[in-house]
């Protein structure tokens, strides 16, 4: 049995023939043109066709993956509509008398080089990748070349690619695409996250799969352990068929837990919740037996609108989610705009590092007219369910007090106007900045609850962009530095009689879950498709056995891998 090893990105086992997702030849020759107007018209047609493509892909992505994953295509369309980008291309055509292909390449190369040179700026690195993806699409229309369309796959296959762009992944049809394997990527890359949303096995970061496999080769993909079996024998296929059936049986057992509580062997109860981006995601939450919504990302209300959403529009969205959850808690995060989330109708200053700049609560406190509108809508909606409000990107106690003060002010105004507001309204904050994790004991006196955002907390603590492959090895959720911060937050909240949740990727991670249960995390919020798996895992745990495990994990010698093995060994007999 010959195996190729990679990073297990999405659980499951699949056997099928390889489908090579090969990028077409987009080479061209530089040429001098005499009719600039005609060439600019060619460019405009290619831009329009590309925008049309992206609108279609975005719709497919929203239906199959949800609004959060579809949002990346909004960024792509914004590039195509950016006058600085398109104007520079037109300028090249007019001034240098070059064909549209050459003008596009020169301008795109300049933008990409500028962004990629900012190695400490995650936002700019992501924009560079977006420009490459968009440029490829526009160039294909200029050349009359068809890009690969995974949506046209009509037989059972395993997709093999050097990498999968968000556009590629969004078009994968789970009926026929049984799995995918790539040369590059990590567990937190766009393609990996989308694979988990689609519930298809995936392995990334193999480095050589496109060299080791050719179209039509029979493969087995083990997305649980990160193995690709090349040229499997009948015995190999039979062995993995048994494993696949065992996994299917396991999922069927998970289904039985839909209406059960999340309880450990020794009777400790936890809340397993789901994250959503829009009211459309509510169906998945209910289908998977979530006990709450631990994170409602309200920024998509703003991103899916051509203008600032009105108070009434927001009220209706919040009300529909609260009513849909039928009394189960809903934690709503106030607007988290900035960083990688920009609004065409709300210009933000250009910054060297937007992720550490004017974003989230910093915008809300500065533009309290926008903030107050959202808070009024939330307060009005509080009558229709169990609402929890939390503020993102809080760094100081003063920020939290200011935000809560504005909330209390709007609440008083509504009551004075004769409107009712729920008297069971908790107000908390995201813990995603190391400063707030370190000083959790001070914040715990002010808040009703904490919600730990591990995606940003890990990046800021380790000074490593999780989307940058050069430093992604430092994105270490099991690093003892991260574990100590998390434990500090949980302990601080409990000391004050408050509760702590987690809404980052780590909450649904099979290695992190036993550690988090041992630390006493109260609420685990994750992708809806992970809820039953985590609930099942909890039933195998005895909290009395976890104290020593946690103590060892927070004191290892800065080794992410050591803690991973520690938990894996611990779970073998459970």
From Swiss-Prot:
Active site: 190, 503
Pfam families: PEP-utilisers_N, PEP-utilizers, PEP-utilizers_C
Subcellular locations according to the entry: Cytoplasm
Residues given in the record as phosphoenolpyruvate binding sites: 297, 333, 455-456, 466
Tree of life domain: Bacteria
GO-annotated cellular components: cytoplasm
GO biological process: phosphoenolpyruvate-dependent sugar phosphotransferase system
E.C. numbers: 2.7.3.9
Needed co-factor(s): Mg(2+)
Major localization listed first in the record, in broad terms: cytoplasm
Keywords carried by this UniProt record: Cytoplasm, Kinase, Magnesium, Metal-binding, Phosphotransferase system, Sugar transport, Transferase, Transport
InterPro entries hit by this protein: PEP-util_enz_mobile_dom, PEP-utilizing_PTS_enzyme, PEP_util_AS, PEP_util_C, PEP_util_CS, Phosphohistidine_dom_sf, PTS_EI, PTS_EI-like
UniProt record similarity statement: Belongs to the PEP-utilizing enzyme family.
Subunit note: Homodimer.
Chain's role: General (non sugar-specific) component of the phosphoenolpyruvate-dependent sugar phosphotransferase system (sugar PTS). This major carbohydrate active-transport system catalyzes the phosphorylation of incoming sugar substrates concomitantly with their translocation across the cell membrane. Enzyme I transfers the phosphoryl group from phosphoenolpyruvate (PEP) to the phosphoryl carrier protein (HPr).
Domain comment, as recorded: The N-terminal domain contains the HPr binding site, the central domain the pyrophosphate/phosphate carrier histidine, and the C-terminal domain the pyruvate binding site.
Protein name: Phosphoenolpyruvate-protein phosphotransferase
């Amino acid at each position: 049995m010959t195996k190729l090893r990679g990073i297990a990105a999405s659980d499951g086992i699949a056997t099928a023939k390889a489908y090579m997702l090969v990028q077409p030849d987009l080479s061209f020759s530089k040429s001098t043109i005499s009719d600039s107007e005609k060439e600019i018209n060619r460019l405009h047609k290619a831009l329009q066709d590309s925008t049309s493509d992206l609108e279609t892909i975005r719709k497919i992505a929203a239906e199959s993956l949800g609004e959060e994953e579809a949002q990346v295509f909004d960024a792509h369309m914004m590039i195509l509509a950016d006058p600085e980008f398109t104007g520079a291309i037109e300028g090249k055509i007019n001034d240098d008398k070059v064909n549209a292909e050459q003008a596009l390449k020169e301008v795109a190369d300049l933008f990409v080089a500028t962004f990629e040179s900012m190695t400490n700026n995650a936002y700019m690195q992501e924009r560079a990748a977006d420009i490459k993806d968009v440029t490829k699409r526009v160039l294909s229309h200029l050349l009359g070349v068809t890009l690969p369309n995974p949506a046209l796959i009509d037989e059972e296959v395993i997709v093999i690619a050097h990498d999968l762009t968000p556009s590629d992944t969004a078009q994968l049809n789970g009926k026929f695409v049984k799995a995918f394997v790539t040369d590059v990527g990590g567990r937190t890359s766009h393609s990996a996250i989308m694979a988990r949303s689609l519930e298809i096995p995936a392995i990334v970061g193999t480095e050589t799969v496109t060299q080791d496999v050719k179209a039509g080769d029979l493969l087995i993909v083990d997305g649980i352990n990160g193995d690709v079996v090349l040229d499997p024998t009948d015995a190999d296929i039979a062995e993995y068929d048994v494993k696949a059936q065992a996994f299917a049986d396991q999922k069927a057992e998970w289904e039985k837990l839909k209406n059960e509580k999340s309880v450990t062997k020794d009777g400790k109860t936890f809340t397993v919740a789901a994250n959503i981006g829009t009211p459309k995601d509510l169906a998945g939450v209910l289908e998977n037996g979530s006990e709450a919504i631990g994170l409602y990302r309200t920024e998509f209300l703003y991103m899916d609108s051509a203008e600032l959403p009105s108070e009434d529009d927001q009220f209706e969205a919040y009300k529909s989610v609260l009513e849909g959850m039928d009394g189960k808690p809903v934690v709503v995060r106030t607007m988290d705009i900035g960083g990688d989330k920009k609004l065409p109708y709300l210009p933000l200053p250009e910054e060297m590092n937007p992720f550490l700049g004017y974003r989230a609560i910093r915008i809300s406190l500065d533009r309290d007219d926008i903030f107050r509108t959202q808070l009024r809508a939330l307060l009005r909606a509080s009558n229709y369910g169990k609402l929890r409000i939390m503020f993102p990107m809080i760094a100081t106690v003063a920020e939290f007090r200011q935000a809560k003060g504005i909330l209390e002010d709007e609440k008083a105004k509504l009551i004075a106007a004769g409107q009712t507001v729920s008297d069971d309204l908790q107000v908390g904050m995201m813990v995603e900045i190391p400063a707030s994790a370190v000083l959790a004991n001070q914040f715990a006196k002010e808040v009703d609850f904490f919600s730990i955002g591990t995606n940003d907390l890990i990046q800021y603590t380790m000074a490593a962009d999780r989307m940058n492959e050069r430093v992604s090895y430092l994105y270490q959720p099991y690093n003892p530095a991260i574990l100590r911060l998390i434990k500090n937050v949980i302990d601080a909240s409990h000391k004050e009689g408050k509760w702590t949740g987690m809404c980052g990727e780590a909450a649904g991670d099979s290695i992190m879950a036993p550690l988090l249960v041992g630390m006493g995390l109260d609420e685990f919020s994750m992708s809806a498709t992970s809820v039953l798996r985590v609930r099942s895992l909890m039933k195998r745990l005895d909290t009395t056995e976890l104290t020593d495990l946690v103590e060892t994990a927070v004191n290892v010698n800065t080794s992410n891998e050591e803690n991973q093995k520690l938990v894996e060994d611990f779970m073998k007999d459970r």
